């Protein structure tokens, strides 16, 4: 009996030590961690800030993001500070429903443009049921999280107003909310510029070249960007030479899976190679992590 109790005691101590070390290693390390999750043909990004706060940008086309969050969030953490949806298309939006159901979310960021898809309706229902605070953001607004500054480059107030007007017209007619094709939603995709010391990252959603023309050359871009989340999964309409020459990204991450669209395109790859970008793809490498201390950075 004594040996049995001793075994339980030792086992309990070992378990306690494992939990303690897991807790210690999950504490904020003062670095920025950006995880581009492998969710197939879609986008889902988890950002853990130097002070321990966190943000999710898009949720991918399914629940795969939950597995990604489980790997990179502390095991005891069921709270996410900010969730942002770049635009309401399934390959960016659907997984956010599972995120909102599983985690307590403080703020939900979006543009004031939607659609009539069942997925978007379900997402709004969960946001309402969970009483998540919603913030509608447009170009020029900033979010400060510790030493990190996130600036919104797109959409502008005028673009959102245009989308709202189209929404009114088409919702009355029983058609799709935003014009005649869901591709129009890409025109309203949130574009975030993140700065942490000397480290810069650009998150582009599905914004294509005719959107990029509205912010290429902005005064926010005063030096080479370290990380580019490549627009629209590497679509041939996602970037042009002016965009790539403006950014000259050190690292370009393409979030992509098996698809029938030819993503990533040869044109996109060639543009990135022309400026010497390191190209990483989730379909070939799985989750991709970029870590920065505000001065240096590395790919994990």
Regions found by a protein language model. Give the residues of each.
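Non-globular, low-confidence helical/coil segments that flank catalytic cores
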Residues: 1-300
């Amino acid at each position: 009996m004594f040996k049995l109790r001793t075994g339980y005691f030792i086992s309990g101590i070992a378990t306690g030590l494992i939990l303690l070390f897991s807790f210690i290693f999950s504490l904020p390390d003062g670095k920025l961690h950006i995880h581009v999750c492998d969710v197939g043909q879609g986008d889902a990004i988890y950002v853990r800030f130097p002070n321990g706060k966190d943000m999710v940008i898009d949720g991918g086309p399914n629940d795969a993001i939950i597995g990604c969050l489980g790997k990179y969030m502390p095991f005891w953490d069921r709270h996410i500070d900010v969730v942002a949806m770049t635009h309401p298309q399934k390959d960016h939006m659907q997984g956010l429903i599972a995120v909102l159901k599983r985690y307590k979310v403080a703020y939900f960021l979006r543009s004031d443009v939607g659609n009539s898809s069942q997925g978007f309706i379900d997402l709004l229902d969960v946001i309402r049921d969970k009483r998540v605070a919603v913030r509608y953001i447009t170009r020029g607004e900033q979010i400060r999280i510790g030493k990190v500054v996130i600036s919104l480059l797109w959409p502008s107030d005028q673009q959102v107003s245009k989308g709202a007007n189209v929404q009114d017209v088409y919702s009355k007619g029983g058609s799709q909310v935003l014009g005649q094709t869901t591709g129009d939603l890409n025109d309203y995709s949130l574009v975030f510029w993140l700065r942490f010391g000397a480290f810069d990252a650009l998150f582009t959603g599905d914004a294509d070249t005719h959107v990029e023309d509205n912010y290429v050359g902005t005064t926010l871009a005063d030096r080479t960007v370290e990380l580019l989340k490549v627009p629209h999964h590497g679509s041939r309409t996602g970037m042009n030479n002016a965009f790539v020459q403006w950014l000259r990204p050190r690292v370009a991450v393409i979030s992509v899976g098996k698809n029938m669209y030819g993503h990533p395109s040869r044109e996109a790859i060639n543009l990135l190679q022309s400026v010497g970008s390191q190209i990483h793809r989730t379909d070939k490498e799985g989750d991709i992590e970029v870590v920065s201390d505000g001065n240096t950075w590395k790919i994990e």
